[in-house]
Design a protein with these regions (language model features):
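Cytosolic nucleotide-utilizing catalytic cores of signal-transduction proteins
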Residues: 1-185
C-alpha cells in the first residue's frame, strides 16, 4: 500500500512519510533508484505480472507495484556503483528481454517526496530509448538526458527551423536527379 500511495502522490510531506515508516515498522533508506517496466503486447497485464514475479528475488531492498499498466520497482539502500548495480541491470535486462518488454531506470535520488520527478525519468528513458535505440530493452535515464530535454522542443518546431539550408539544397538536388543523400555527400 505504501508504494501505491507514494507513486500516486498521496504522501506529500515528511510528516506523512514518517507516519508511514512508523506504521510499517521499518524505514526505507536512501539512496533510491526507480525502475519502470512496460510491456507492449497483447497480454500486457499478464506480462507485467510475470515480470513482477521474476523481479521479486532480484534485490533484497525493493518495493514492487503495477500502477497504470507500468511495473515500478523502488530499490532502496541502492548501491551507486559496483557489481550489485551491474548485476541488477544485467538480470533485469534478461527478464525484460524474455517478455519483450522495456525498462527505464532513473538516476539515484535521496528524497522519496520527489519520486514523481524520478517516475518521469524512468518513463522518459523508455520513450527516448525506443526512439533512439529501438532494440534496447534497458534504458538508463542518464544516457537519455539530452534527448529528454531536446525532443519535446524539436517535435514542436517546423523542420526548417533546425535543418541547415545546405541539407535542404542537397535533398532538392537528390529529388531532381533521383540520387540518394549519402552518395551525394
Amino acid at each position: 500500500v505504501f508504494i501505491s500511495e507514494l507513486l500516486s502522490g498521496n504522501i506529500k510531506n515528511e510528516k506523512q512519510l514518517n507516519e508511514w515508516f512508523q506504521d510499517m515498522n521499518c524505514e526505507i533508506l536512501p539512496p533510491y533508484i526507480l525502475t519502470a517496466v512496460t510491456a507492449r503486447n497483447s497480454d500486457e497485464k499478464l506480462a507485467l505480472s510475470m515480470i513482477r514475479r521474476s523481479c521479486q528475488s532480484l534485490l533484497p531492498n525493493q518495493l514492487i507495484l503495477i500502477h497504470d499498466n507500468v511495473l515500478y520497482i523502488l530499490h532502496y539502500k541502492a548501491s551507486k556503483k559496483g557489481s550489485s548495480l551491474h548485476e541488477y541491470q544485467s538480470s533485469l535486462t534478461k527478464i525484460v528481454k524474455r517478455f519483450h518488454a522495456q525498462a527505464g531506470i532513473s538516476q539515484h535520488f535521496s528524497n522519496l517526496l520527489l519520486i514523481e520527478d524520478y517516475k518521469i525519468q524512468t518513463l522518459d528513458a523508455i520513450k527516448y530509448g525506443q526512439i533512439l535505440n529501438p532494440d534496447a530493452r534497458l534504458c538508463l535515464y542518464q544516457d537519455y538526458i539530452l534527448p529528454a530535454i531536446l525532443y519535446p522542443r524539436i517535435e514542436q518546431m517546423p523542420v526548417n527551423n533546425y535543418m541547415p539550408k545546405s541539407l535542404e539544397n542537397m535533398n532538392a538536388y537528390d529529388m531532381e536527379n533521383a540520387t540518394e543523400l549519402l552518395p551525394t555527400l
